[in-house]
């Protein structure tokens, strides 16, 4: 596809996230346009399509994927629908940007990894947007530069003001902690081998039955320690912080003032961020711009992604499965996942 041709995209699922992506493609990022809109709510799909020139509503998600005026697909549908929809994209040979999770369990995610590998192409990108955030990319660069020395410990905090109706304790692991799982793998370039979830005193203001906050402890292949506080009913603000402690210094992101490092003078700020869109809007924009470019240039190499792929989705699912088991038992749980080199082309 030439640079002067627009990539034609179907967006499946136009709730808060999907509608944001439609607006992002239509009004913020060049090189692509939304041609098909799909949602389980026909009224919602029609509402978004009416705001998106040149788009039309397709009622059936699989018809939307197969449509002739669709070159690539964005999935912002509920997690339980992802497996069949991603497989349909592979069958159609169409690149897909799938919001997390890739699927809702490790076995089906691994099956998708194998199905993509059998095609000999990289068609699946998973929407772990933090990898595209300026602060996270700064932190990754700092780690890789060696300025902090060998990383030893990572401290994370993930706080939300509130959660939607129906949110439960396991979803804190699968829907919230999953981001800390991915950034740990991204920053340290190694797999997580065990998880333990600690249940501190629960927030009395949280919806009944939710164990919130939770503290996760990860161990990585090389023995590094990562701890993550996840508190999703703070009632205050959206906060995501990560601190890496190395042999030669430390660095922290997420304080609304940019990266702070203890190898040089830092600063402090007192602002708060109301939600994920304000905190990670730039990351989403960068993620989509890079994905669109990768899809448009992928025919020559067979690589249609620029970011986390199917393997990363599988790894996250495997770690979260261990996390849910630990939440139930209180014990350290070893992550059950296959070695990457056991799947040719993964």
Swiss-Prot record:
Record flagged with keyword NADP: no
GO BP term (any one): inositol catabolic process
Keyword terms, alphabetized: NAD, Oxidoreductase
InterPro entries, sorted: Gfo-Idh-MocA_inositol_DH, Gfo/Idh/MocA-like_OxRdtase_C, Gfo/Idh/MocA-like_OxRdtase_N, MI/DCI_dehydrogenase, NAD(P)-bd_dom_sf
Entry keyword Methyltransferase: no
Gene Ontology MF annotations: inositol 2-dehydrogenase (NAD+) activity; nucleotide binding
EC identifiers of the protein: 1.1.1.18
Catalytic activity of the protein: myo-inositol + NAD(+) = scyllo-inosose + NADH + H(+)
HAMAP family listed in its UniProt record: IolG (MF_01671)
Family, as annotated: Belongs to the Gfo/Idh/MocA family.
Function: Involved in the oxidation of myo-inositol (MI) to 2-keto-myo-inositol (2KMI or 2-inosose).
Oligomer status and interactors: Homotetramer.
The protein's name: Inositol 2-dehydrogenase
Source organism of the structure: Rhodococcus erythropolis (strain PR4 / NBRC 100887)
Protein encoded by which gene: iolG
